[in-house]
Amino acid sequence: MGDFVEDFVRYLKEIAAKWREEWERARLHEADVDPNRPKFYVTAAFPYPNSPMHLGHSRTYSVTDAYARFKRMRGFNVLFPMGFHYTGTPIIAMSEKVKQGLQALRSLGEVKTILEEIWKIKVERNLSIGEAIKEYLRGAGREDLMDKTDSIEYLVLFYKVFEIPVEDLEKLTEPLSMANYFASITEEGMKELGYMIDWRRKFTTVDPDFQKFITWQFLKLYDLGYVEKGTHPVAWDPVYDTPVSQHDTKGDVEPEIEEYDVILFKLKDEDLYLPAATLRAETVFGVTNVWLNPEAEYEVVEVDGKRWVLSKKAAYKIKFQKDEVKSLGPIDPKKLLKKMVINPATEEEVPVLPARFVDPNVATGVVMSVPAHAPFDYVALKELEGDPEYSDIVKSIELVQVIRVPEEGLLVPQLVEKLGIRDTSDKKKLEEATREVYSKEYRKGRMLESVLERVKGDERLRAALKAFLGNDPVPDAREKTAKWLKLFGAGDVFYEIKNAPVYSRFGNEVVVKVLKDQWFLNYGDPQWKELARKALARMRIIPENFLKEFEDTIDWLQKRACARTRGLGTPLPWDKRWIIESLSDSTIYMAFYTVVNILRGASVEPEKLQPEVWDYIMLGKGNPKELEEKYGISAAVLEEARRSFDYWYPVDSRHSGKDLIRNHLTFFIFNHAAIFPEDKWPRQIVVNGFVNLEGKKMSKSLGNIIPITVAIRSFAPDIIRLVLLHSAELGSDADFRTEMVSRAISNLREIKSIVEKVKDYNGPRPANLTMLDAWYLSSFVKDVENVTNMMEDLKIREVTNVLYFILLNRTKEYLNALEAMGRGLDEVAKWVLRYTVERWVKMMTPFTPFFAEEMWHELGFNTFVVTEPWPVKDEELVNPLAEAAKEYVEKVIEDIKEIIKVAKIEKPKKVRIEVASPEQVKMLKMAVEFVNSGKSLREFMAEATKVFGKKEAKSLRQAFERATSLSESMRSVIARGEFDEKAVLEEFKRLIEEEVGSEVEIRRYEGGKKRPEPLRPAIYVE
């Protein structure tokens, strides 16, 4: 950055520090109940303090703060609170990693020196942090510490990226100490960014009073029947023996559980089963063979008394899903090839064949082959046909069609040929074909009755199956087939992590465990789902395109484990061995913000906050006098808390990242719908995308994370806010780029210089405005209206584009035109600019609040700008004629320049402009009237030729075509007969001369060879 840029950034940081101090001294961001003002309650997802806040976190909070400031200036009493989420395993896992990392480094030498050396290797060799650590360990001859790479990586990140002093790293080895340390850094970062947060309401989820609130919530859910104990598959950390959800995993990945149907194919003449895992049980009637991967490791495992052949990974996973599991040792898959197995559905014998496309890490590692309905199977068989060892077997295999799709033949052979798939190495095309086949068959397919003839046994069985399955839609047939196979012991289930591999915060790969005696929130309860749908239907989702994802999530959500055996948080009230997990204690905490400052201000002891107390505060049930007698809490305090909750609730706008739609945000809807009356249900959810850095995803391994403290020191708070808010539309991912930082700095400097031009001006409103002044003001008051409407819809990128780019460029254009026309900043122009700047500064407040505050005071005001009313559109200043005139003049200047360029005239002496005759103007006026009333060219010509004669048919047709292409403002002034081309050009003559570098003469057409059209003057350049 150049000196002037550095000076301006220093200035921005200085004014940010100054105004932060002033705001805090004035307690500007504190919000209390005010019955005389409408309220607006806005919340954003509270952060996990398991690391310092960085740029990626700050987008959600910057959007929320901009919206909160806007609503405050629109006359609302706005509350924006913040707390910290300590619940669950993330903080414990991180503190353990730090402890392990420090132990490893201390065994090598001095911690600081080693961290510096690792960073040097990373930078010099352009490696990831993890690769640099491994290089260092190899060089030190300490390969035995390779398994501690992940732990050391966090230390490098904290020390070099987050700039945490080495002496403070020890503080991070104890969970609560770490949480408090990072929470204080995050709070400071939020204050430095100017967020309008009422910090009196801060709490953590391990605070005793909050835990009493969560206890009340869960007792309510239990009484409603939404908390159940039972058996259910859950994502599981196999080392720490605890369920995991999104907040418990590395990268905040939600483990998705997928249920496979298992179909048991018994080896002929052997007590051994090949358990084929499938998502398409209905196709079992068309199985031609079973696949094993000859390169994979397999084991024999006794499952519920039967000997299953499973991949090594599946043999490990099955132990978490079944009670009766016994490992019987490895088995060579090659020894099973060519053997025959029995299809349990048809009792047909089919061969076991090799396929390297079978992934031993997915489900059982055994796949049934249905080539008529699976592109991979079809192509693999074609491939195997060329292998002499298997050629005869494959040639004897015939495709068996199980499903028919109306007006389609067998889809698989058609698609394989269409896509030009040659072999199984063409995975992308095979996956594309698979998706298309599965989709069409699922949506349109029906079971063929004829395929059920393959079932062995008596005719009665086949008849029963035809009645049971024949002609069924695929989804029904799938479910029925799986149930039928399970009924006689030939079917089972296997659960898999669909988006594997997913790792817990402790670094262990997550598996699926079928958990018994586990506590669940039953989001599958039909009554609860209906309430959630009702609540969602009444809400506004921004951006609207995310609504379907909410609807889909409500539909597929089922039971969800709500408690853990490990982690920070609130014990389950009726079974204190369990801790309520992080996505279950973060659904209605927004209600706690509304009263926490009152209860703590009155020094209410947490033990007194029994369920009856919360019933009164949150639901208005009970008598405060009786509660005072019973629990010793002042009735006045209880009544104040009740009034506060009743005033602030419901949440008017909830803000979060789009990754939380499928869990937290939907749980937020469910829990509010269950516990609170309808008038307290949330009104709006706002979702935003993520933040990239210079086009790349921010990653701890790459070390390309910018902590907020570092960003503020480098760029200043207002610049960070503006770049984050301007770089993408709400639902898209933002990109924090140095180029955009430079533009933001440059534009704020220019805006400051504009403000300084009129900071001391306080003259009266002029009696008359020129066309130029009127154009500028008319455009501006329209901006006010557009910006206001866009902010209501949170189209923040469009708003910042208007305020910091379009309006700035238009203002510069206005100032340049003033100079060109010889006016300079005269008294009228000063008033125009002052009028604009005052309102412009107000509208910048949500986005660059420190800069706006400084500019507001530069203009001579002594109030805080956020307490000022938002600008409103001044209808008196709307001037379509001035806008049309400026539009017209710009086009004329553009045409003149083009003529000069084409004619290659270096120094034009004179430009003559001839405008259309009055009669032609009348033609255009009539054409505009017809266009405005929706009439056709034919209707226009029929009437116009009566007025102007048939000889003018060509001109009339041109006039009509011209009328259809005009802007709305131009059409309106033409229709009113207000637009005089010659007068407009005369008024802007000096500007035109300055722009084209020549003397300009303007006159009306009085005859001649080149006849000008209305708004298309004839131009002659000498």
UniProtKB/Swiss-Prot annotation:
Record-linked Pfam families: Anticodon_1, tRNA-synt_1, tRNA-synt_1g
GO MF entries: aminoacyl-tRNA deacylase activity; ATP binding; leucine-tRNA ligase activity
Disulphide bond pairs: none
The entry's keywords: Aminoacyl-tRNA synthetase, ATP-binding, Cytoplasm, Ligase, Nucleotide-binding, Protein biosynthesis
Positions of transmembrane segments: none
Catalysis: reaction(s): tRNA(Leu) + L-leucine + ATP = L-leucyl-tRNA(Leu) + AMP + diphosphate
Residues reported to bind ATP: K700
EC main group: ligase
UniProt EC number: 6.1.1.4
Motif 'KMSKS' region: where in chain: 697-701
Subcellular location: Cytoplasm
Coiled coil residues, start to end: none
Principal subcellular localization: cytoplasm
Segments carrying motif 'HIGH' region: 47-57
Record protein name field: Leucine--tRNA ligase
Lineage of the organism: Archaea, Thermoproteota, Thermoprotei, Desulfurococcales, Desulfurococcaceae
